Amino acid sequence: MELKLNRKYKDTLFRKVFNNKKDLLSLYNALNNTEHMDESLITINTIEGAIYIGYKNDISFIINSELNLYEHQSSVNPNMPVRGLIYFAELYKGYIDQNNLLIYNERLVKLPFPRYVVFYNGTEDEPEEQELRLSDSFEKVLEGEVQRTDIVEAEANKPSVEVAVQLLNINYGCNQELLEKCQKLMEYSRFIALVRVKSDMLTEKYKKEMKSVNKKEIFADAVALAIDEAIRDNVLKDILSKNMAEVTDMLLTEFDEKAYIEGVKKQSYEEGEAKLAKLVVELKKRGRVEDIAKVTDESERERLYKEFNI
């Protein structure tokens, strides 16, 4: 089964909420415990229309010699630092070109300090804050493979490139102090929580009524109810009242993407199970019982896959 997803980019609700400098500055202040009031300090440099690794970042901007990359994600992906590396490279290239910086000159080129923050509001339990690092993706140099005797293992495993991602859980009830510092972030968190409450309520309602309604239809109904209630309660009222259809479309697109990702994971798991079963059969045929116990180790499993051309 081949799974497909329309990769044409659409704005996320998070980006819609923070696409103006006033609210973006409020979010920056909340994160950094600053009190900047001058919106002109912000230079937004999001690479418009650029999709990298199948995703587009939500917002990037420069303020006070800091290059900030903000993303919203509904799932925790350990490859976020890899995507960040690629996107930061593009941002710095643009900055160097725009400012006519001479990187081959003998004078040191000054660049804005990078900060990468991901705002998580998925349904899985995650800590309020965690850090993901690019170096976790790098293959480590084993002690026996260190060729130069003057380099200890710790130094050999010190990467020349690093990207650190600050991952913040903004589900309603998490990081309360941060949410209270930024009104729009609080409202965004409340609205997403409201959509989920309505979705659970409708799922239970249709189940009791024995109605056959698919998940996407339930979600669409939940979004409509959540928007109405949010407007009444003055939650993202300015955005929801003016852009009701657009917001609905954004959330349904995010729903489709989540369903796609879950489908890919399920397919990958099933394919992996079939591959593993084939390997075990081959090992049994050859009487290599001792190797069957080794398949729980990823590196050994991959070695055996290569050996049997699976």
Model-derived features: positions:
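Elongated, amphipathic alpha-helical interaction scaffolds
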Residues: 1-310
